[in-house]
Amino acid sequence: MEITNAEFVISNTDVKKCPAGTFPEYAFIGRSNVGKSSLINMLTGRKGLAMTSATPGKTMLINHFLINNSWYLVDLPGYGYARRGQKGQEQIRTIIEDYILEREQMTNLFVLIDSRLEPQKIDLEFMEWLGENGIPFAIIFTKADKLKGGRLKINISAYLRELRKQWEELPPYFITSSEERLGRTEVLNYIESINKELNSK
């Protein structure tokens, strides 16, 4: 898939105010500071499309970007940023859950995982919750360029082992690096394949 057009449409905290229409939506979510904004900018080829920050927890809104005038890329708030405080975390959780459970246009959720880390309980519990609610999702391992030698393979294998404890069939997964544009083609082709399937119905 070639992205010829990517434009910001709207930010909000209320799923009912998300764009009308039937365009499929591909949402991106992950723990704070997982590299979500950098990944979105890399995928779209637009350096400043999503705001990047070294400070975790900056994305507090549901952000819609219209891609090729045919589908939406949705940037969801990051989860698990403790310094927001309990009230702030609850507000973010409500925004995330409302979008994921109520937004009919959401076609696939991409869960971003920092490939530098061992399996994190918060990520595994979030994916288990997705499974319990029948939410279609794929995993994107980020920051692959930060690991040397066989560490990347070891970390991903550890995650897959943990997932197999919960899942009979593993969700699709992709390995990416925003710095090296690794995985861009694979993720976009995956989105394109789903769009083609939807259009054939």
Swiss-Prot record:
Its cofactor is Mg(2+). It holds the Pfam family MMR_HSR1. GO terms for biological process: division septum assembly. Belongs to the TRAFAC class TrmE-Era-EngA-EngB-Septin-like GTPase superfamily. EngB GTPase family. It comes from Bacteroides fragilis (strain YCH46). Keywords: Cell cycle, Cell division, GTP-binding, Magnesium, Metal-binding, Nucleotide-binding, Septation. InterPro entries: G_ENGB_dom, GTP-bd, GTP-bd_ribosome_bio_YsxC, P-loop_NTPase. The gene is engB. Signal peptide: none annotated. This is Probable GTP-binding protein EngB. Necessary for normal cell division and for the maintenance of normal septation. The lineage of its organism: Bacteria, Pseudomonadati, Bacteroidota, Bacteroidia, Bacteroidales. Disulfide bonds: none annotated.
